Amino acid sequence: MLDTRLNFEKRDFIEYLLFHYQFKSRISVWLLNFIKMNHALIEKIHFVDQIVADHPTLEMAVSDAPVIAIQYHEGETLLMNTDEIFHQVIRHSQQLDVKIHFNHEANRDLRLDHLLLQQLLATQNGDAYHKDMYHIEFSNSTEQQIIHLLKSHIDLSLNLKDIQLFKHYTKILNLIKLRHITDKT
């Protein structure tokens, strides 16, 4: 299995989480370390800001977040604060969303925002994750750079006659533009 740049970004983000945050549950630390070292699992995880209702999701909380320490839900299954979560995740063979609950009073984690953006750019059939775009914070200059990059990718996809990529990058560009429309209303 090839390691993509996105998988490196995910591993780097997990390292960052383990180094900069303390989690409420030891199971969270076990899982993050396991995911980081498991090539098949790192490929299947998708970090999220907004939970997608019908997706299997692992939720973990840092120590000062006002939510439950760890929970896993998939379909009708809901596990909270139990070692069984570890076993469910390591046996998981499909896409798995990972939500990290931070302290709401603290500033947004910019590293999370960076990873969310990288995932949105890399995932062509990730429409379910587009809500995350409305919560990512970036400066005006960063936004302009992203818009410029997206326009370049759109032009390239047109030159290559790649309709899928054209639609994907156009959709992301429109989401960025929509952020400002919703801000004004």
Q: For each predicted feature, which ranges?
A:
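Short, charge-rich amphipathic alpha-helical segments embedded
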Residues: K167-T185
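Conserved tryptophan-centered aromatic signature that marks the ligand-binding surface of SH3
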Residues: K161-K167
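Charge-rich, low-complexity N-terminal segments
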Residues: M1-V67
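Short, charge-rich, low-complexity alpha-helical interaction segments
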Residues: S93-S141
